[in-house]
Amino acid sequence: MASLPEPQKLARNFARCNDWEEKYLYIIELGERLDPLPDEWRNPDNLISGCQSQVWIVAQPDEQGVIVLHGDSDAAIVKGLIAVVFSLYQGLTAQEIVELDVRPFFESLALNQHLTPSRSQGLEAMLRAIRAHAAALL
């Protein structure tokens, strides 16, 4: 699994950025930390509909029931958003993912105000897809 910051650290790092250009660069840097997605996982079953860019997300439980997320995108900023989402869900079980509303976290970053409408819709599609994957594992 990629080395992603805990949500509190991510929020602190985000707040330390001086402007939105730095924040976007930080998001892109987070995306670069994601492990490469195997080609066999880049298939229609793992493709997230509702995203303007191509986004693939795979959710698998480990031996302890913790959901391990894998993902990629053909767009750097979207790949970074995947990493932000994954940092919020890392270490959680399927039940915890289904019950967790991460939208307040994104609101606290004011991220939706600075994303294009299509990226905001794509972010929402990613959140729905991860929760649906988790719910299917219950």
From Swiss-Prot:
Transmembrane segments: none annotated. It comes from the Bacteria. It is found in: Cytoplasm. The keyword S-adenosyl-L-methionine does not apply. The active site is at C51. Its main location: cytoplasm. InterPro entries: Cysteine_desulfuration_SufE, Fe-S_metab-assoc_dom. GO terms for cellular component: cytoplasm. Pathway: Cofactor biosynthesis; iron-sulfur cluster biosynthesis. Keywords: Cytoplasm. GO terms for biological process: iron-sulfur cluster assembly; sulfur compound metabolic process. The keyword Transport does not apply. Coiled coil: none annotated. Gene3D superfamilies: 3.90.1010.10. Belongs to the SufE family. Homodimer. Interacts with SufS. NCBIfam families: PRK09296.1. Participates in cysteine desulfuration mediated by SufS. Cysteine desulfuration mobilizes sulfur from L-cysteine to yield L-alanine and constitutes an essential step in sulfur metabolism for biosynthesis of a variety of sulfur-containing biomolecules. Functions as a sulfur acceptor for SufS, by mediating the direct transfer of the sulfur atom from the S-sulfanylcysteine of SufS, an intermediate product of cysteine desulfuration process. This is Cysteine desulfuration protein SufE.
